[in-house]
């Protein structure tokens, strides 16, 4: 398939600049894959579509305050975006402007806190060693909001309410729509919950630069699926319930582990790239936001629901002025 097959027109004003309050008041487009039917609801109406015996699989990763502003000894301003911890006090990071940071360059954050560039990393990143603890480092940082969000948004609002495992540089945004009250209603209905971790890296958002999408290489991301979740997944399948993935990160993790030898728990890195045609072996339904044109995430939902149906739904969403991307509205696809 070609990259241009996943393009669509999106007016800039439909890119959500701030989240909806309360979280579950966001709009919800419901897509029935089999009947090719589209409905328009509010996110809290998801209760109507989830049933007793369904398993809602959530990514409980927590976003780190990854964006930090510093300066060189010359006074030149440098922006640091933490990507991944390599070892104690050593991180892979993006730096801006990159031309000003070479091997041995020191970046100061205040009078006592600084980092030194040890080396170049992959694709223009840098390996930085900090002279402060992780806790002190995180106090200097702020939410790494996507570049298309121009408004300031509180760090807490860029986390899911159930986030607990620190390590992502972007939120698993499908989960941002859930409230405590909504989770309680789902629980009362008999919906089960299971948690996994996939630490979202910038690779998820890396633009596809090749017209033949099969040539695109995904960046690998760390995941962990505990034994309790593994057991719940296979019990749900055995009992005829549905595996409902909250977000594309949960989908990628689930469809990674089902292709591995059966284990009690799973821990590793995945670079799975899901695009049409793809055989989904675990995921039966998906909660997700509206994704960028030509993105790997749009390819994933196209693989799940059919490209033509998804592109039709996106065009309808544009006409009906749905809000797009990280703080935008949601889709439920089943």
From Swiss-Prot:
EC nos: 2.4.99.17
Top-level taxonomy: Bacteria, Thermotogati, Thermotogota, Thermotogae, Thermotogales
Organism: Thermosipho melanesiensis (strain DSM 12029 / CIP 104789 / BI429)
Protein encoded by which gene: queA
Subcellular location: Cytoplasm
Protein name stated in the entry: S-adenosylmethionine:tRNA ribosyltransferase-isomerase
Cellular component per GO, a single term: cytoplasm
Domain of life: Bacteria
Reaction(s) catalysed (UniProt annotation): 7-aminomethyl-7-carbaguanosine(34) in tRNA + S-adenosyl-L-methionine = epoxyqueuosine(34) in tRNA + adenine + L-methionine + 2 H(+)
Class of enzymatic activity (EC top level): transferase
Pfam families: Queuosine_synth
Pathway(s) per entry: tRNA modification; tRNA-queuosine biosynthesis
InterPro entries (alphabetical): QueA, QueA_dom1, QueA_dom2, QueA_sf
């Amino acid at each position: 398939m070609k990259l241009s097959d996943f393009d669509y027109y999106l007016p800039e004003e439909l890119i959500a600049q701030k989240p909806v309050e309360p979280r579950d008041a966001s709009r919800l487009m419901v897509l029935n894959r089999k009947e090719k039917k589209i409905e328009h609801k509010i996110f809290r109406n998801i209760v109507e579509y989830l049933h007793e015996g369904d398993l809602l699989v959530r990514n409980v990763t927590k976003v780190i305050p990854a964006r930090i502003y510093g300066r060189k000894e010359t006074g030149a301003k440098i922006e640091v975006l933490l990507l991944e911890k390599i070892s104690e006090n050593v991180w892979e990071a993006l730096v801006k402007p990159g031309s000003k940071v070479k091997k041995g360059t020191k970046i100061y954050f205040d009078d006592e806190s600084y980092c030194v560039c040890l080396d170049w990393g992959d694709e223009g990143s840098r390996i930085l060693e900090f002279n402060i603890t992780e806790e002190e480092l995180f106090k200097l940082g702020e939410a790494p909001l996507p570049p298309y969000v121009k408004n300031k948004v509180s760090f807490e609002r860029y986390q899911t309410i159930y986030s607990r495992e620190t390590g992502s540089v972007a939120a698993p945004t499908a989960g941002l729509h859930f409230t405590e009250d909504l989770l309680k209603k789902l629980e009362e209905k008999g919906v089960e919950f299971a948690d996994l971790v996939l630490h979202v890296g910038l690779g998820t958002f890396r633009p596809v630069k090749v017209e033949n999408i099969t040539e695109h290489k995904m960046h690998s991301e760390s995941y962990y699926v505990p034994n309790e979740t593994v057991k719940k997944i296979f019990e749900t399948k055995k009992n005829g319930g549905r595996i409902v993935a909250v977000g594309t990160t949960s989908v990628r993790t689930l469809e990674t582990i089902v292709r591995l030898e059966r284990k009690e728990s799973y821990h590793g890195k995945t670079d799975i790239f899901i695009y049409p045609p793809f055989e989904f072996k675990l995921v039966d339904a998906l909660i997700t936001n509206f994704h960028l044109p030509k993105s790997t995430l749009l390819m994933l939902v196209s693989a799940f629901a059919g490209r033509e149906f998804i592109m039709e739904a996106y065009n309808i969403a544009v006409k009906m002025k749905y809000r797009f991307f990280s703080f935008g509205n949601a889709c439920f696809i089943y």
